[in-house]
From Swiss-Prot:
PROSITE patterns: MI, W2. Residues 179-207 are annotated as: PABPC1-binding. Phosphorylated at multiple sites in vivo. Phosphorylation at Ser-1187 by PRKCA induces binding to MKNK1. This is Eukaryotic translation initiation factor 4 gamma 1.
């Protein structure tokens, strides 16, 4: 708990010259500051508890409440006089109780002789005084009175304010401590001078001994307190020596500060209403010293009250309660103001009687500070006037004239609505004008009026807050109060019965009368309190209860009858706080003075001896074993079934009154109230527990009861509800539970727009994931169309799509090119932001932010790795350490892969111009600064990807710096060899002008994968044939030798198969045979095989082989092409040498672009083969580029007996195998560029330019690169490579390449001669290509057609030039027809015919001699080229698919039937209009537009009704109707035969009279094989329709 430790010490030393009582060990003598020397009392510390500080010493532990209530006198008993009091002997227990006493308005100053110290005493320093020293007042010494101090209650969650002025002390008998919250404690009073004799009975019965203090008695007030508690009575309290002495020496004749009741409205928790200052009347036999508190005010909830002080005069014991006249002393003014924000200095009250003038006029106490603190400057005059003589006090003794004194000390509990402290009234007459904001004294002298009534005190809630703000002033006031405190001794008087009754009531309600001075700085405590640091276990008061705040002050006019009745009234508030627990008041009424449950030892902590430590023996503690509190489960403990707490749920210990539960749920009471401990039952004990109105005491916010101060707990108490296992426990059901789509009802689907949007968003994400999973280079175009059709219209959806694409891109770096291209297509996508719909955010910005976030994620990854490394190092076992090590390695590997994937993706984005060079340079610099391996690896990946784009003339100095740094890293050898080699590879790549040694290992197309699979299967088949042929050869007994001599096709160059196999049982090792047939398995010097294999796939389908054959035999066993006609070779005789040579020769055509060195290596290897003679001659051909025609002629001469099919296949193989060999030629590093590039250099650079252009589609950069070649005479190589590299790629790639060539021609960088020369080399082989590429003419047309557009080559010139190499082969018209067809699609037949005629072209130029032009034109449908006939549109351009698209566009645009008629008449001739093609296209389009694409699919009959006239016009007979039904059948099959769709169409068509019955029957019985797809399912779906049709006919026939 947050209470300051206060050690218990021995009794204080005796002060010289003062009579001191003897105290038992552990009990500190009370102190009264009456010595001339201003000695501060320092009481040994003791453990603090909750409750009022001044009563702490007399409370037992909160965990030890009395088991039964002690009997006491009813609070309503009238006040009665007691026996004559006596002067306290030295050993009597006395205590100073600060109290606000009202006097007559005598303003005369008084002088107390012997008081030579300052008015104020420092509250924090207290010194022991030797007992027995002579004092100024007879029978009293400073040790007999506890210093008055504000108690610090760490257990109470209230605001505490510093005390600034010690109230006037009044010496009185030591009252028993009020029981803490919920405690039922019987207070025992023992006399230490009589050996600890219990004198409680004597005190409570009215008798007294010579050494026993007599407690005062207070009357109860019928007025309710602001917090709903009943008025409190004064209690007998032992002096608290910890607090500072109160100051004497007030200002005679000066009233206290004005303080009107309504001057302050406080928002905090209420305090009891202050009572008017009591007026002491003569008649007291003992001397009562009243101290005037000048200057600063107390800060424990007190409001300054002004009373006139009387100089204490020594009286003899036994005299009645009167004030002896003292002519030299003025009637003292008691000004006591206590607030709870700081410790309250404990004032001591003298036992000498007070002389109060009858002419006293009550003064209003006015608080000038917000918290009720009197400014220090106002206090100085009081100190100075304390020495003035006072008028003689009144001597008559009249207990009835005593005015009630409001309690002065009010602990923090009361500030939050706790019961007001008991007040001792010195007169039954109260002063109403002082009622509002005064707080009466917290203690009285024990010899005060026999029946002083109680007046409630009040400290409004706002005062508490304002008091907290004035801590500095209050502390200053404390210091001043030490200077002026003077002591007035008091004598004890007998205690009437009513006083004992009121005492018990006060004890039960736990109201402090004297609050000890706190020891720690109040500001610190207030700060802790503000944030809830102070013992939360006792914070049960809701500090902000509106009902309590607005409570008006009550109890200002208590009459004797009302004060004595002590009948609680119903409070207006709905919640009560801490010490206002009703059960305490209830039990306090039944406390008997002579009863006490627990017996305490003399040196043990007990209500009367709070100085001792809380030490208990075994027997004492075992007495609490089975009490109710011991059976309660503390807060915060784990659920243990053995705890008896659950019994409270099943058998409540008390009968619950619903009226007492206004803020909480009715149920078992788990309150660990200490007042309930040991109580047999609470259900039938008088009025309900609680204060007025029976309200249940609650903790903070009414959430639960307050807890003991013995241990901290949370502010709110958890109520554990009982669980009855027999009940049917219902589980919580989510309002929006997830359901599978198949089980979702219509209501679920219509659950609001937000759910609909969320569902649409998730559906969008699912579709994007599906598209990304399918994304391949081959599927890119069609998948991108799907992506562009997606509804990405919100920021959330856009971010989600970006995250999906990004995660996919970095997780699959091999596909980063495709993902980057997808991002490029979506770059312009913009959506409005969520916060500001008027502001848009685009795809590119969000994507770059995502890339940057991932790029800069390394710091977070490092932190995670360090944490995992630390966990691994701290692992206890080797097994755990191994597991953590695996996790760490896995995390690092994942982070590394993500970093590399992100770098690759960033590079691809840069290549697509989505990132700027500055960003990339920043990335390079950042990676280069970090010398860790991950960063360097990312750097190598990045430079490999984008180095070529960054390394241009302007950026060369910067790139040089990068590479110098990389060279330095390599030389330092501080990194691993793997990283150094990667860096070296990048350096080599730059030296080779960024031309890689190997091709880009991108993903393969599905067609390529299928072809490779077919090829592998074909290889295996050839192996089997070779083995079979070899086996048959051996059986013939032929001598082993080179296969060229025997015509076997399986011989390698190395001649391994020439080694004879011994006859016998030696088994054949098939694995070794497989190795023999594999290229490169024999020749150990085959260094060029691997590069060729790595590069072969990079050209896509045109690359073909996937491996570069290194010798002749490998070409025979594993063809380098994907020639699907290569299976024809298997049908030829194995002995046919020419067939073998055909396949071998294909490799030479691929080698023609090699350098001399590469060719020499190949020659050297070929010489080791059996047929090296033939290959040697052919391999020594010059290394110049030869025309394709010459090569074809040479091949034709070498193979005269070769079949035509194989010749074409071989020529195609040679052509397609050329590129891999050319790529091999790029392997050696290229020397720095020369003024004139060689053929090989131009070829290499041309390949790089073409690949880059096809990848980036950057026309401007490609033109610039071609210009930089500076070899205009060799640009035909660029043209040839451009055509070859795109011939088997996509249509878009060919169109792009054609546009690039057109741009080069228009810009003048490429001459027409160079263009034609490059085109010739390809066209010469076109005939051979047609075998492998049936659509080769269309593909060539797609490459050539862009040349004819916009300032290109004239049509006549182009057509005549491109047909030159094709006329001998008779293929000129094939290419021209494809070109004209493409031109008609873009320009229209009319314009194409006009261009043809303008160019002066004639078909006779291109046809073979003797071929009829007219028949050719009619057959090929190119009449538009013959003049007027071209006015009719060419029918070829409106084939079924094109016609369907045009009609679909018209219908989609909402065109009317007449518009469709007009379009058909304008674009189709009569033959096409009458054809089945139009009918099928029209039927398909109309029916498709009538489908409602929902689940399930439905037919929009209205659309068919509108379009019925359109269909009826062209479905003019049964045959046309049948064709229309066929088209409808095909459409339904395309849609995967949706249920009932065809039946709905049939019904609509029949109803609209579009199709007649005969046509339906004809369709049903049709056996046309071309229309049988899906016919069975379609017939089954319309069976009901035909049944109905037949029934309708039967009915019609019956009617007829």
């Amino acid at each position: 708990m947050n209470k300051a430790p206060q050690p218990t010490g021995p009794p204080p030393a005796r002060s010289p010259g003062l009579p001191q009582p003897a105290f038992p060990p552990g009990q500190t003598a009370p102190v009264v500051f009456s010595t001339p020397q201003a000695t501060q009392m320092n009481t040994p510390s003791q453990p603090r508890q909750g409750g009022f500080r001044s009563l702490q010493h007399f409370y037992p532990s909160r965990a030890q409440p009395p088991s039964s209530a002690a009997s006491r006198v009813q609070s309503a008993a009238p006040a009665r006089p007691g026996p004559a009091p006596h002067v306290y002997p030295a050993g009597s227990q006395v205590m100073m109780i600060p109290s606000q006493i009202s006097y007559s308005a005598s303003q005369g100053a008084y002088y107390i002789p012997g008081q030579g110290r300052s008015t104020y005493v420092v509250p924090t320093q207290q010194y022991p005084v030797q007992p027995g020293a002579p004092g100024f007042y007879p029978g009293a010494s400073p040790t007999e009175f506890g210093t008055y101090a504000g108690a610090y209650y760490p257990a109470q969650g209230v605001q505490q304010f510093p005390a600034s002025v010690a109230p006037a002390p009044v010496l009185m008998n030591q009252p028993p401590q009020i029981a803490p919250k919920r405690e039922r404690k019987t207070i025992r009073i023992r006399d230490p001078n009589q050996g600890g004799k219990d004198i409680t009975e004597e005190i409570m019965s009215g008798a007294r001994t010579a050494s026993t203090p007599t407690p005062p008695q207070t009357g109860g007030s019928l007025e309710p307190q602001p917090n709903g508690e009943s008025p409190q009575v004064a209690v007998i309290i032992r002096p608290d020596d910890r607090s500072q002495g109160a100051a004497i020496g007030g200002r005679p004749g000066l009233p206290g500060p004005e303080h009107s009741p309504g001057t302050e409205s406080q928002p905090s928790s209420p305090s009891p209403t202050p009572s008017p200052p009591p007026i002491l009347e003569p008649g007291s036999e003992s001397n009562l010293g009243v101290l005037s508190i000048p200057g600063d005010t107390m800060t424990t909830g007190m409001i300054p009250m002004s009373v006139e002080e009387s100089t204490p005069i020594s009286c003899e014991t036994g005299e009645p309660y009167c004030l002896s006249p003292e002519p030299t002393l003025a009637e003292p003014i008691l000004e006591v103001e206590v607030t709870l924000s700081k410790p309250i200095p404990e004032s001591e009250f003298s036992s000498s009687p007070l002389q109060v003038s009858t002419a006293l006029v009550p003064h209003k106490v006015e608080t000038h500070e917000p918290n009720g603190v009197i400014p220090s400057e106002d206090l100085e005059p009081e100190v100075e006037s304390s020495t003035e003589p006072a008028p003689p006090p009144l001597s008559p003794c009249a207990s009835e004239s005593l005015v009630p004194i409001a309690p002065t000390a009010q602990p923090e509990e009361l500030l939050n609505g706790a019961p007001s402290p008991p007040a001792v009234d010195l007169s039954p007459v109260s002063e109403p004008e002082e009622q509002a904001k005064k707080v009466s004294s917290a203690a009285l002298a024990s010899i005060l009026s026999p029946a002083p009534p109680v007046a409630p005190s009040d400290t409004s809630p706002a005062q508490e807050e304002e008091m907290e703000e004035d801590d500095d002033d209050e502390e200053g006031g404390e210091a001043e109060s030490e200077k002026g405190g003077e002591d007035v001794p008091l004598d004890s008087t007998p205690v009437p019965a009513q006083l004992s009754q009121n005492l018990e009531v006060a004890a039960a309600t736990q109201v402090a009368v004297s609050v000890p001075k706190r020891r720690r700085k109040i500001k610190e405590l207030n700060k802790k309190e503000a944030v809830g640091d102070l013992l939360d276990a006792f914070k049960e008061v809701d500090p902000a209860v509106p009902e309590v705040e607005n409570q008006p002050p009550t109890g200002s006019n208590p009459s004797p009858e009302s004060e004595g009745s002590m009948v609680p009234t119903q409070p207006e508030e709905t919640e009560e706080t801490w010490d206002s627990k009703e059960d305490k008041i209830h039990n306090a009424e039944n406390i008997q003075p002579g009863e006490q449950k627990y017996e305490y030892k003399s040196d043990q902590w007990k209500p009367l001896n709070l100085e001792e430590k809380k030490r208990y023996d075994r027997e004492f503690l075992l007495g609490f074993q089975f009490i109710f509190a011991s059976m309660q489960k503390p807060e915060g403990l784990p659920h243990i079934t053995d705890v008896v707490l659950d019994k409270a749920n099943k058998t409540p210990l008390r009968q619950l009154d619903p009226s007492r539960l206004p803020g909480i749920n009715c149920g078992p009471d788990f309150t660990p109230s200490f007042a309930n401990l040991g109580r047999p039952a609470l259900s039938n004990r008088g009025p309900p527990r609680g204060g007025p109105g029976g309200e249940l005491p609650r903790g903070p916010a009414g959430l639960g009861p307050r807890r003991s101060q013995q241990g901290p707990r949370k502010e709110t108490r958890k109520i554990i509800s009982s669980v009855i296992m027999t009940e049917d426990i219902k589980l919580n059901k989510a309002e929006k539970a997830w359901k599978p789509s198949s089980k979702r009802t219509a209501a679920d689907k219509d659950r609001g727009e937000e759910d609909a949007d969320g569902s649409k968003t998730q559906d969008l994400f699912r579709r994007v994931r599906s598209i990304l999973n399918k994304l391949t280079p081959q599927m890119f175009q069609q998948l991108m169309k799907q992506v562009t059709q997606l509804a990405i219209d919100t920021e959330e959806r856009l971010k989600g799509v970006i995250d999906l694409i990004f995660e996919k891109a970095i997780s699959e770096p091999n596909f980063s090119v495709a993902y980057a291209n997808m991002c490029r297509c979506l770059m312009a996508l913009k959506v409005p932001t969520t916060e500001k719909p008027t502001v848009t955010v685009n795809f590119r910005k969000l994507l770059l932010n995502r890339c940057q976030k991932e790029f800069e994620k390394d710091k977070d990854d490092d932190e995670v790795f360090e944490k995992k490394q630390k966990e691994m190092d701290e692992a206890a076992t080797a097994e755990e350490r191994g597991r953590l090590k695996e996790e760490l390695e896995e995390a690092r590997d994942i982070a590394r892969r993500r970093s590399l994937g992100n770098i690759k993706f960033i590079g691809e984005l840069f290549k697509l111009k989505m990132l700027t060079e500055a960003i990339m340079h920043d990335c390079v610099v950042k990676l280069l600064k970090n010398h860790d391996e991950e960063s360097l690896e990312c750097l190598c990946r990045l430079l490999t990807t984008i180095g070529k784009d960054l390394d241009f003339a302007k950026a060369k100095p910067r790139m040089d710096q990068y590479f110098n740094q990389m060279e330095k890293i390599i030389k330092e050898k501080k990194t691993s060899s793997r990283i150094r080699f990667m860096l070296q590879d990048v350096l080599d790549l730059r030296q080779s002008n960024w031309v890689p040694r190997r091709g880009d290992q991108g993903p393969k197309t599905i067609d390529q994968i299928h072809k490779e699979a077919e090829m592998e299967e074909h290889r295996e088949h050839i192996k089997v044939q070779q083995l079979m042929a070899k086996g048959s050869d051996k059986r013939r007994g032929g001598p082993p030798g080179p296969p060229i001599n025997r015509g076997l096709p399986l011989v390698d160059d190395g001649g391994w198969n020439t080694v004879p196999i011994s006859k016998g049982s030696r088994p054949i090792d098939t694995s070794r045979l497989t190795k023999i047939t594999k290229p490169g398995s024999i020749d150990s010097n085959n260094q060029l095989f691997a590069p060729g294999g790595r590069l072969s796939w990079g050209k896509g389908s045109s690359g073909g082989s996937g491996a570069k054959p290194s010798d002749t035999a490998s070409e025979a066993t594993r063809p380098a092409t994907l020639n699907r006609f290569s299976a024809l070779q298997q049908t030829l005789p194995a002995e046919n040498t020419d067939n073998r040579r055909v396949v071998q020769r294909s490799s030479l055509s691929r080698e023609r672009g090699e350098k001399a060195g590469d060719r020499g290596d190949r020659l050297e290897r070929s010489e080791r083969g059996g047929d090296r003679g033939d290959r040697l001659d052919r391999a020594r051909t010059p290394a110049t580029k030869r025309s394709f025609s010459k090569e074809v002629e040479e091949r034709s001469r070498e193979r005269p007996s070769q079949p035509e099919g194989l010749r074409k296949a071989a020529s195609l193989t040679e052509d397609r195998g050329r590129d891999p060999v050319k790529r091999e030629a790029t392997l050696p590093p290229v020397s720095p560029p020369k003024a004139a590039l060689s053929v090989d250099e131009v070829e290499k650079k041309s390949k790089a330019i073409i690949e880059e252009y096809l990848h980036l589609n950057d026309m401007k950069e490609a033109v610039q690169c071609v210009q930089e070649l500076a070899s205009p005479s060799l640009l035909f190589i660029f043209v040839r490579l451009g055509i070859e590299s795109t011939l088997e790629r996509s249509t878009i790639a060919r169109e792009h390449m054609g546009r690039l060539l057109h741009q080069l021609l228009c810009a003048g960088h490429l001459s027409t001669a160079q263009y034609y020369q490059g085109l010739y080399e390809t066209l010469e082989l076109a005939e051979d290509m047609e075998i492998d590429i049936p659509h080769v003419w269309l593909y060539l047309a797609e490459l050539i057609t862009p040349i004819l557009q916009e300032d290109g080559v004239p049509m006549g010139e182009l057509f005549r030039e491109i047909t030159k190499p094709l006329r001998p082969m008779g293929k000129a018209t094939s290419l021209l027809l494809e070109i004209l067809g493409l031109l008609c699609k873009s320009m229209g037949p009319k314009k194409v015919g006009m261009l043809w005629r303008e160019a002066g072209l004639s078909w006779r130029e291109f046809l073979a001699e003797g071929q009829d032009v007219g028949s050719f034109v009619a057959e090929k449908k190119v009449e538009y080229t013959l003049g007027e006939e071209s006015e009719a549109p060419g029918q070829r351009t409106l084939a079924f698919e094109e016609l369907r698209r045009q009609l679909e566009k018209l219908l989609k645009d909402g065109g009317s039937n007449q518009r469709v008629f007009d379009w058909i008449d304008a674009n189709l001739n009569e033959q096409q209009i009458a054809s089945n093609t139009l009918v099928r296209a029209l039927m398909t389009t109309v029916c498709y537009s009538a489908i409602i694409f929902e689940t399930p699919l439905r037919v929009d009959v209205q659309v068919l009704k509108v379009r019925a006239r359109l269909l009826q016009k062209y479905l003019c007979d049964e045959q046309k109707e049948l064709q229309a039904l066929y088209a409808l059948q095909a459409l339904v099959v395309t849609l995967e035969q949706p249920a009932n769709l065809l039946r709905m169409f049939f019904d609509a068509l029949y109803d609209e009279d579009v199709v007649k019955e005969d046509a339906f029957y004809s369709w049903e019985s049709s056996k046309d094989p071309a229309e049988q797809q899906g016919k069975g399912v379609a017939l089954k779906s319309v069976t009901a329709f035909f049944n109905w049709l037949r029934e309708a006919e039967d009915e019609e026939s019956d009617h007829n």
